[in-house]
Regions:
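A well-structured
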Residues: 1-312, 323, 598
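Long, K/E/R/D-enriched contiguous segments that form extended
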Residues: 294-338, 372, 398, 445, ...
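Catalytic zinc-binding patch centered on the HExxH motif and its immediate surroundings
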Residues: 315-317, 350-370
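Post-HEXXH active-site segment of zinc metalloproteases
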Residues: 385-388, 399-423
Length: 599
């Protein structure tokens, strides 16, 4: 096989592909389950108008809905994994299209379940919860019930549903404008060859060692945003207005409170994150000064903050070697964890290598009762792919242990917890790799990587989180959200987080208009809390705190049985305090000290 060309799927050895037979032994078996779902889901209407009739009736409805969901999850998982391995395969595209049409119909048919559970009177609901027949559904029923104060009348809910497309349209407008309509042109790379500048390639230009190329990419990229800045300000403004409207319509005190309510996160946790990071910006500013000095620049600009301080190290690590490094790094978690992961990786949980039509990047996904699967595009000369494997393995083991321990209805964990397990694995890998090498260049590379990870997930995402809070508060106060308001508020944050050692080009103010996550408000703070919780948990395990390993494994196994803060507290980390964030900030400063000594 010519290694300079991307192989076709058929050219990849079977042992290097994931084994989807755990889901379905054949496409025909998938079709059988799909047909069963098609013929069975209409039976949901048998319970319409009757959910609160009796304990027995509600239990029957929940069990039937569960049986349906298990089938739906599995057929969906199989189809999505096949499409990920070859996005051009017409059979795979057809299956996914069939599913999407069916899901719409099922969603409409099942839409009565939650409102009817919320409509059960308080006395009857309390009696239902105490009945042994509903014991295994208690957590789910309580989570549904706690939303009751924020659910409106049937007529009002219908009006909100009818308006949802209009309220959500700003996200689509933003995506179409930035991904399709905006054209960024081409740049001459370091070899003098023309390269397209796009949303996806912009980041690749910023890590180039050629300062002039980074500068050109930055200005050319933001010139296009400047041409559309008023439109982008309008779409963001109306997205914020939609958030505030929904929060007020559902009787929340603020859009922030509305977003945090589902996971039972107090606003004080969000505010505490911002306060803790704000109070510890000095080491970040020191890091930028180190960057300026090491890169040999008279002044540092934002486009100089992504290029690695240590040039990409030459490496040749096979997938099997990467797997062994990851497994060795996870030894502190004990045999149950390491043996299960090793057996899974050797047993074709992972689709290892790039092939034509395969989805780029990496992910982990699972469905109840089957192994989790990992998509990789592993390259033996890209050292960061070892980290990617550790990261995705963390997600997979979280899913694996939760599903093997909990009932279906309690196994799924929220996004707030999802990044904890994956980042935890990266922390253990970093610790292991630093223990295994005395090579100063390799140590500097690993430490610089960890510093930049913390910078990107804790400092940068907290800055974004603060911006979201500011602009929603302005809207709630009645202030107009204009282009100048967005740029002014964002520049204040840039000045605080970058410090006086970074030259702030005027174009950088436009960065606030290009962040897709701002159209899914108050999401990004979860990256900051996730990395903080992961580092705090990893430090407990690595320092040998009694019971830390058992507590961490208990966290992985708990799934969605409790709300996120309770789950993490049981594992030994209290996110209601600033301690985990401050622990991560101290690690950042320790690593910075080490990097300064090495460089």
């Amino acid at each position: 096989m010519d290694e300079t060309k991307t192989p076709t799927r058929d050219e990849i050895p079977e042992t290097d592909k994931w084994d989807l037979s755990h889901l379905f032994s054949s496409a025909d078996k998938w079709s059988e389950d799909f047909a069963w779902i098609q013929s069975t889901y209409p039976r949901l209407t048998t319970w319409k108008g009757r959910a609160g009739e009796s304990v027995r009736t509600l239990a029957e409805l929940l069990e039937f809905d569960k049986a349906l969901d298990l089938k739906i999850e599995r057929v969906s998982h199989y189809a999505s994994l096949q499409l990920a391995e070859d996005s051009a395969n017409p059979d795979y595209l057809s299956r996914m299209g069939q599913l999407q049409n069916l899901f719409t119909k099922i969603g409409e048919t099942a839409s009565f379940i939650v409102p009817e559970i919320q409509a059960i009177d308080d006395e009857s609901f309390a009696r239902f919860l105490d009945d042994p027949a509903l014991k295994k559904w208690r957590t789910r029923l309580q989570k549904i019930r706690r939303l009751k104060p924020h659910v409106l009348s049937e007529k009002e809910e219908r009006l909100l549903a009818l308006g949802s497309s209009a309220l959500d349209g700003y996200d689509d407008t933003f995506s179409q404008l930035t991904d399709v309509d905006m054209k960024f042109g081409v740049l001459l790379d370091e070899k003098g060859e023309e390269r397209p500048l796009t949303q996806s390639s912009f980041g690749a230009f910023l890590v180039k060692r050629d300062h002039g190329l980074r500068k050109s990419a930055f200005h050319k990229f933001y010139d296009e945003f400047k041409d559309h800045q008023f439109t982008l300000a309008a779409t963001l403004s109306y997205s914020v207005k939609a958030d505030v409207f929904r929060a007020r319509a559902r009787n929340y005190n603020s859009a922030l409170e509305a977003s945090l309510f589902k996971d039972d996160i107090p606003v004080a946790v969000y505010d505490g994150l911002i306060a803790a990071v704000r109070a510890n910006l000095a080491p970040l500013h020191r890091y930028y000064e180190l960057r300026r000095r090491v890169l040999g620049l008279e002044e540092l600009h934002a486009y100089d903050t992504y290029v690695p301080l240590v040039a990409e190290i030459e490496t040749d690590v096979s997938f099997d070697q990467a797997m062994e490094k990851v497994l060795a790094s996870l030894a502190p978690l004990g045999g149950e964890y390491v043996d299960s992961l090793g057996k899974g990786l050797r047993g074709r949980w992972c689709d290892r290598y790039e092939s034509k039509g395969k989805r780029s990047g990496a992910f982990s996904s699972g469905s109840y009762g089957a192994p989790p699967y990992i998509l990789m595009n592993y390259k033996r000369d890209v050292f960061s792919d070892v980290y990617t494997l550790a990261h995705e393995a963390g997600h997979s083991m979280h899913t694996w242990l939760a599903q093997r321990t909990q009932l279906y209805q309690e196994a799924d964990y929220p996004i707030f917890l999802a990044e904890v397990a994956s980042t935890f694995n990266e922390e253990l890998l970093t610790h292991y790799l630093l223990e295994q090498t005395n090579d100063s260049k390799m140590r500097a590379y690993i430490i610089n990587r960890q510093i930049d990870d913390i910078r990107g997930t804790l400092f940068r995402q907290t800055m974004f989180a603060e911006f979201e809070k500011v602009i929603h508060a302005l809207e709630e106060s009645g202030a107009a959200l204009t282009l100048e308001v967005f740029k002014t508020e964002y520049r204040k944050l840039l000045a605080a987080y970058f410090g006086s050692g970074v030259m702030l080009d005027p174009e950088l103010e436009l960065e606030c208009l290009r962040i897709p996550h701002f159209y899914n408000a108050f999401y990004v703070y979860k990256y900051s809390t996730g990395v903080s919780a992961a580092i705090a948990l990893a430090e407990r395990v690595l320092s040998g705190v009694p019971g830390a390993v058992e507590a961490y494994l208990g966290f992985l196994k708990s799934g969605g049985t409790k709300f996120p803060l309770e789950t993490l507290q049981a594992a030994g980390v209290d996110m209601r305090t600033s301690a985990p964030v401050e622990s991560t900030l101290r690690l950042f400063e320790r690593r910075l000290n080490e990097l300064e000594d090495l460089l």
